Amino acid sequence: MILKGCLLYPLCSPRNKQRCARLWKIAYGGLLKIVTGSLLTFYVVLCLDGGMVLMRKQVPSRFMYPKEWQHLTMFILLTLNGCVDFMSKNVLPQRCVGLEKGTLVLIIYELLLLMVSHVKDSEGVELHVYSLLILVVFLLLLVLTAELWAPNMCHLQLMETFLILMMGSWLMQAGFILYRPVSGYPWQDDDISDIMFVTTFFCWHVMINASFLLGIYGFSSFWYHCFRPSLKLTGPKEAPYYASTPGPLYKLLQEVEQSEKEDQALLLPKSSP
């Protein structure tokens, strides 16, 4: 009876399976990009007291807040990238990976152009920090461009993951260097040791991110080689329990059901007045 109940009432109903499948197909990465880009966009717009004014009213007219407008453009691009990912995975009838990759490459191209012009009035430590960031963005652009013609090369995908990790971690490090130094004292542009340590920190980021990726790859490889063979061996043994074709277990269940019906038929005359 226990086996029969397990077969007739499975743990996951078809409705729950369909719901889990729909949740699994949601582009969470795209939603995260949309939410993050939107929040940062609102932050840039609201952080200025006078608002995002494009040009001042005095004569001669000049553009105002050039860096803030560049930040706003970057965050809007991030939001648009998330919208494209979400539409490709959840709105279109069939996912278009080429559209996602092409949009990402175009956005990285624009990001590189914005970064190059972003450092025009920078110097010292700030210029060095942004130069290293531009180097990472440029290498990422090359890898993404190569992926358009070779989308299934695992080496390019690994390099893409590493460079995205580098860009994210170095952006956080740049925030601490330029705006909130850990020591509490601002970095000195005229001190050569500060500029040298910026490069040292960048090399540390390279080693940490590479070790992080290597650890994930090593753990995944270990898990695959240790547990994958056992799954392959136990898979065919469990298959007959879920098959609909008649087998020994199916015949046993029929015999149990028939015996229960006979017992009930014998009990009915005794219980009747």
Curated annotation (Swiss-Prot):
Covalent S-S links between cysteines: none
Q: Which PANTHER family match?
A: TRANSMEMBRANE EPIDIDYMAL FAMILY MEMBER 3 (PTHR46441), TRANSMEMBRANE EPIDIDYMAL PROTEIN 1 (PTHR46441:SF2)
This protein's UniProt keywords:
Membrane, Transmembrane, Transmembrane helix
Specify where it is mainly localized: membrane
Similarity remark: Belongs to the TMEM45 family.
Highest taxon listed in the record's lineage: Eukaryota
Q: Which Pfam families match?
A: DUF716
According to the UniProt record, one GO cellular component term is: membrane
* Membrane topology according to the record: Multi-pass membrane protein
Q: What is this protein called?
A: Transmembrane epididymal protein 1
What is the native source organism of this protein?
Answer: Homo sapiens (Human)
Which positions, given as ranges, span the membrane?
34-54, 72-92, 96-116, 129-149, 158-178, 195-215
Q: Specify whether Thylakoid is a keyword of the entry.
A: no
| InterPro entries named in the record | DUF716
| Intracellular or extracellular location(s) | Membrane
